[in-house]
């Protein structure tokens, strides 16, 4: 089983030194950079680039720069998806968004977890657990969604003050 398949299966995998994993992450970083350098008025070019990044797009979407993700191929967005500035998605595992999802600025979705054992951590081993966001969800500013979390439909998530 290669490192990418280990990640998708929820096993510890080499996220830092495996050539294929690093190349895929670098390719996505280049596309995110290209997207983030677009003029805000060039929505056509932005949409073209996002369609190269995101694994599955099921309908209308707005993604406001800057936007960052690790691979993009593990991300599915439903219809009527909106994310404000500075959304970060660490998608070592699947990140699935339902329909009518609205995301405020500075939100992080992180499927990435690190090995508990210091020796494994020093080898660059990580684990990735999927994140699911249901339909009709609003996620407020500065929220961090951690590995393995599911957010139910018709809900709101916000950072307490």
Pin down the residues of each PLM region:
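Terminal amphipathic alpha-helical/low-complexity segments used for targeting or macromolecular assembly
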Residues: 1-59
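Flexible, glycine/small-residue-enriched loop-and-beta-strand segment within the central core
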Residues: 67-77, 82-151
């Amino acid at each position: 089983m290669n490192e990418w398949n280990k990640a998708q299966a929820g096993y510890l995998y080499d996220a830092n030194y495996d050539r294929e994993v690093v190349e895929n992450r670098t390719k996505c970083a280049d596309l995110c950079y290209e997207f983030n350098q677009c003029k805000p008025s060039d929505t056509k070019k932005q949409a073209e680039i996002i369609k190269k990044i995101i694994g599955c797009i099921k309908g209308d979407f707005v993604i406001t720069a800057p936007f960052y993700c690790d691979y993009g191929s593990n991300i599915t967005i439903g219809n009527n998806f909106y994310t404000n500035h500075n959304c970060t998605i660490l998608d070592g595992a699947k990140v699935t968004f339902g329909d009518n999802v609205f995301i405020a600025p500075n939100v992080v979705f992180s499927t990435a977890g690190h090995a508990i054992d210091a020796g494994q951590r020093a080898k660059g081993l990580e684990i990735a657990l999927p994140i699911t966001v249901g339909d009709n969800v609003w996620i407020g500013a500065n929220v961090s969604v951690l590995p393995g979390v599911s957010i139910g439909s018709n809900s709101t998530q916000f950072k307490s003050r």
